[in-house]
Amino acid sequence: MGTMLSKQLQVWGILAFLVATILLAGSPGARELGVLVPAEDEVSARQFIASLSKSPQVQEAGLEFKIVVSNTEYPSSQIGSLILAGKFPLALLRSSQIPGYQADDNSLVATSLLSSPLILADSSAQFVAEDSILGVVVEQELGSKGFAALSFWNTAASSIVTKTSVNTARDLMGLKISVPKMQSQDILLEMGATPVSMSADDAVLALDKGLVDASETSVESDGKNESLQTAEGGSLLAQFRHEQGFLVANEDAWVGLRQRERAAIQEAAQEAVRQARLTVLRTEANLPMLAKANSLSYLSFTTLDKEQTAARASWLRDTGNEGKAILELLDEVQRTQPPSPMAPPLAPHSEAPPRIFFATNRNDEGDPDLSYRFGIQRIDSPLSCGEVAYTPDPVRAFGLPHEGEIAVAASQVTKEAKPCASLVSQAGRKNDAVIVFIHGYNNSFDFAVRRAIGFSQDFGVKAPVLVLAWPSQGIGSGYVYDMGSVDYTRPYAKDLIRALLDEKLGTISLLAHSMGSRVAVQVLEFAADAGKPIQNVVFVAPDVPSSNFIQSMRLHGHYAQLATLYANEHDLALKLSKILNRQAPAGLGGADLLLTKGVETVDVSAVDRQTLQTNHSHGFDVPQVASDVSLVLRQRSKASTRNLPSAVHNGFTYWTITP
C-alpha cells in the first residue's frame, strides 16, 4: 500500500511539474484545454500530451493543455460519456471506454477489430491498418457516436505473463488467466484457458498469491511491470492484444475552436502519433531482454498462425455480416505490400496563372491569414467571396495542392451571392467561362483552395476557378457532420448559381469531387428551376447514392449539356460509403459501375489501383485521368472524341482509361 501511494505521489509530482512548466512558458491570454486521460495508461498519456504541447503550431496558436487523470470523480470507464457530455473538451480514449462498445454494438465493428486479440499480427500491422481506409472507417464510427476523432493513440500491445514456463499457446490450456478487459475472454476460452476479469492492481496480487496462473499485462515504455517480477521462472507471451486508443474532442468544443487552433492541434497530433509509435516499437523490441532480466522465457503470438485464425473466427461469430465486410477490407489492405514510391511528374509551369476565387458559407473568423480565416461552423450568415492572391510554387509535383502562401487579393471580402457572381464573371469575360469547383468530405477551406490552385495549373485552364467551400468538418470522423453541411449549403448554392446564370457567361463548368457531388446535383436542380442550362458538369468519384444520382439526372440532367462521371472500382473511400449507406455510390466502378441516360461514364479502374491508398482523387493526381478531365473542362470534349476505349453494357456505352 505504501509503495502504491509513493508511486501515486511521484506521478502527481511529475504532472504538477509538467503543468507548471507549460503554464510558465504560456503566453498571456492563452486558451487552456483540459485533457482527460485514463489513469491506467498515465505514462504513455503524459508522453503524448507533452508531445502536443511542444508543437510550435500549438504554441503559436496560444493553446495550453491541462492533464486531468481519471479518478473516482471522473472514472476511466466514463471517459467517453464525460466527453460527450461536454465535461472536458479533449480526452485520450480507449475503445473499451466508448459508450456501447462493451454491448457488442455493431456500429463499432471496425473499432472492435483493431482492439481484438490476435487479429493483427503486431504493432506494425496495427499502424498500417490505422493509416489505411480501415482507419477512416474507425474514425467515422467514432463520429457516429458523437466524437470528433483527431488522431490515433498507440501504446504497446499487451502480453500474457505465466508463472510456469510455456512453449506454445496450447500450454495455456487449463490455466486461470486474469484479464483487465472482457474482449480478451473469448479467445482465451477458445484456447482452453479460464479468463478471470480483474483490475491490473488486483491481478498482480492474485498472481503473487497463486490465485491465478497467468495475467494479461501491459509493459509501459519505462519497462516497469510488477507482474514480470512476480512471475519469475515463467514465460512472457508478447503481442497478445492491441487496445486501440484515440485523441478525441467533444464535437461542440471542437467546432467552437478557431480554425487556427484546430489546424495546430491536428498538425501537432500527427507528430505525437509518430513519436508514440516509435516508443511502442522500442518498448516491444526491448521485451525479450526484459523477459530475460526477470528470468522469464520469451515467446510472441506473431509466430502462432493457428491462434490468429481462431481469433478471426471467434471475432466473426460475434460480428456477423458487418464483421465480414470489415474483415474483407482489412484483408484487402494487407494483401500486398505497398510498391516502392515513385516520384510523381513535375507540374507544368504556367506563364499566366489562372485566377482563383472563393465563395463560402463557412463562418468568417477574421484571421489575417486566409488559411485560417474560415472555420467549420454552420452560422446563418451571408456568403463570403473574394479572390485568392498567390504566387505559383517554383517546383510542385503534379497532382499536389499549392504549398505557398495564400491571401485575399486587395484584402477585400465581399458578401452575398450577386456581388460574388459579378466579381467572378468580370474575370471570366475574357474566356467567356468560369469553372466552379465543389470540394468533397473532410476538406478544410485551406486545402480546398490549395487543391484548386494546383489542379488549375495542372489542367492548363484559362478560365477563372471559383471554389465553393462548404463547411466540411475537415476530419475523418466528420462524415455525418459533413452530410448535414451539404444540406445546410443548399440555399447558398441556389443563390450563387442563379446569380452566376444571370451573368450570362458562355460556359459554366461544375467540377465536383466526392461528397461535393451532392451539392452539384442540387445545382442542377436550381438550374432546372431557373430554366437555364449548365454547359458542363464533371463528377469525380461522386459520393452520391446511385439511386439518388439516377433520379436527379432523370429529373434535372437535361439541364447539363455535357455530364461526365469518373468511377473507380478500387476507390476505398467509396467502398466505405457503400458500407455506411448500404448502397453503392455513383462513383464506384467495376460491378457497381453506374450507367444512366445523359451521363458519359468513364471507368478509371485500370490506372488507379494503388495499394494502401484510397484511390479517391484520381481526377486530380493520376496523370492519365487528370489529362482527360482537363480536356472536358477546357474544350467540353465528348468522350467519343477523346480517343478512349469504349464498351457497351445493358445498352449503355461507357469509356475506360487504360495505362
Predicted regions: what is each one?
Residues 443-448:
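Short substrate-entry loop that stabilizes the transition state in hydrolases
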Residues 13-23:
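Bacterial N-terminal signal peptides
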Residues 120-144:
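Short, solvent-exposed loop/beta-turn-alpha elements that line the ligand-binding surface or hinge
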Residues 343-414, 419-430, 449-465, 469-507, ...:
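Lipolytic serine-hydrolase domain surface
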Residues 29-120, 143-342:
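N-terminal secretory/targeting leader peptides
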Residues 2-14:
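Bacterial N-terminal signal peptides that target proteins for export
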Residues 436-440, 541:
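The conserved beta1-alpha1 loop
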Residues 512, 516, 520:
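Gly/Ala-rich beta-loop-alpha elbow adjacent to hydrolase catalytic centers
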